[in-house]
């Protein structure tokens, strides 16, 4: 078998449907779009998925609920197992060092969670700690220090 002898399997390909090329083709005149109406017009495929033919859409019929709290604090989360892997004994962990090591993106508001084991004594400075994380840091002789977020 050579490269020029390759061809697709039987039934794997379809012939292109040539529409609007006369009644003898079987796909002339209305080009398989039926008679009148919105779906027979050009641009029919550009309608958004939520469009319901002009009736009030479902999304507008259901009541609004809740709100977005503008003062919600969004924490970047780091687990203890990540600190165990990336930091050495007696090193200081703060949002800046976490950002440098690629554990957080912004480092504006960091919360330390207690997933994993910590065997190294670390000084951890973060905006928030889970109870289990704080306990595990202190159990190995480390320091868990809460810092305040810098407001800009």
Swiss-Prot record:
Pfam families named among the record's database cross-references: Ribosomal_L27A (PF00828)
Annotated region (Disordered), positions in chain: 1-55
Keyword Electron transport appears in the UniProt entry: no
Compositional bias ranges of the Polar residues kind: 28-42
Presence of the UniProt keyword RNA-binding in the record: yes
GO terms of biological process kind: translation
Gene Ontology annotations for the cellular component aspect, listed alphabetically: cytosolic large ribosomal subunit
Subunit structure: Part of the 50S ribosomal subunit.
Biological role stated in the UniProt entry: Binds to the 23S rRNA.
Family statement: Belongs to the universal ribosomal protein uL15 family.
Protein name, per record: Large ribosomal subunit protein uL15
Lineage of the organism: Bacteria, Pseudomonadati, Aquificota, Aquificia, Aquificales
Gene from which the chain derives: rplO
């Amino acid at each position: 078998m050579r490269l020029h002898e390759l061809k697709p399997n039987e039934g794997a390909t379809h012939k292109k449907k040539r529409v609007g090329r006369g009644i003898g083709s079987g796909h002339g005149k209305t080009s398989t779009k039926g008679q009148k109406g919105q779906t027979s017009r050009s641009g029919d495929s550009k309608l958004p998925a939520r469009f319901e033919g002009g009736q009030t859409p479902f999304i507008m019929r259901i009541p609004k609920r809740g709100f977005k709290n503008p003062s919600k604090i969004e924490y970047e989360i780091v687990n203890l197992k990540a600190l165990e892997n990336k930091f050495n004994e007696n090193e200081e962990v703060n949002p800046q060092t976490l950002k440098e090591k690629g554990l957080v993106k912004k480092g504006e508001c960091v919360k330390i969670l207690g997933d994993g084991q910590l065997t190294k004594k670390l000084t951890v400075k973060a905006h928030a700690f889970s109870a289990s994380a704080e306990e595990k840091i202190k159990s190995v002789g480390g320091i868990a220090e809460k810092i305040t977020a810098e407001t800009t």
